[in-house]
Amino acid sequence: DVKNNPGNTADLVVLEKILTQKLTRLFAGWSSSGSQIRSGTLIVQPKIIKIRIVGPFTRIVVGSLAGQSSIVIDLMLTDSSTGGVIANPRIKKNSGAWAGGWSFGLSDRNLHEYVAHIARQYFINNYR
């Protein structure tokens, strides 16, 4: 789905940027706190499984008939010293067609932010 649609490129760049910003800030904060609760290096490899974002023009003209927007990513978390996979959570988030229509596409455009926030919260809940 991702590779077959060249229109996804811009959305991939946006998602990567937001995800990198949120996780980099989180990990930097943990490093600067001096906490030795965990040691070692965690490798985070996000893999986009599906991305479909209805554009603002389409959403305004067609409304809910344009369908829903959705993002599905896998986050493979690997211990760098052992190479063992620690976890591989899947994050799925969608913006319903009616929500997109009523918000004039705002819920579609915010989907990248929602997914990055869920990923950040996953680390806070499981690795702090």
Q: Model-found features: residue ranges?
A:
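A structural "domain/chain start" motif
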Residues: 1-21, 25, 54, 88-92, ...
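Solvent-exposed, acidic/flexible segments
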Residues: 8-20, 64, 68, 105-116
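Surface-exposed short loop/turn segments
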Residues: 29-85, 95-106
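Compositionally biased, intrinsically disordered linkers/stalks adjacent to structured regions
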Residues: 96-97, 101-128
